[in-house]
Structures are given as C-alpha cells and as structure tokens.
Amino acid sequence: ARLAAALSEASRAPLAIARASTQVAELAARIAEMSKPELAGDAIAAVLLAEASSRAAARLVEINLAQRPEDPRLAVVDELVERAGTARDAALTSRKPP
C-alpha cells in the first residue's frame, strides 16, 4: 500500500510536465503556422522538443501507475500525448522548408 501511494505521488510531477509540454507544443505549432517561413524553423523545433517532453513525461506516469489501470490520470496522459502529436503533425505540415 505504501509503494502504491508513493508511486501515485510520484506521478504528480511528470503529469504536470506533460500538461505544460503539451501546451507549449500547441502554442509553438500556432506560432509556426503564423510566422514568416524563415522564422518558422525555431517554432517547429520547439514543437518537436515539447512533444518529446510530453511523451516522456506521460511514459513516466504510465510506469508509475502500471498497477492502477483504473487511475484516471492514465487517460489524461493519453489525451495529452495525442494533443502534442497533433500539434507536431500540424507544425510539420503547415510549413515546407523555404
């Protein structure tokens, strides 16, 4: 019981990181879409890094909660990873290299 509680608590920080990273990915994708072609590369790089961060943090949550498949945070991280991936796809298709 103590281990389960510790793992549950250990999921808090990576969940917060996944949330923040997904928000960064979505914002950077919008910036990439609106920016001048010569400046879009930085925003696209930000999307890719943020998506990777979201995915890595989500995986930590999944590992920590592996013994609690009913935990609603697992669905939350699935959604966050999906959103970050959508942002990545949007950024990569919105701009072609100049």
Which positions does each model-derived feature cover?
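N-terminal glycine-/lysine-enriched basic segments
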Residues: A1-R68, P72-P98
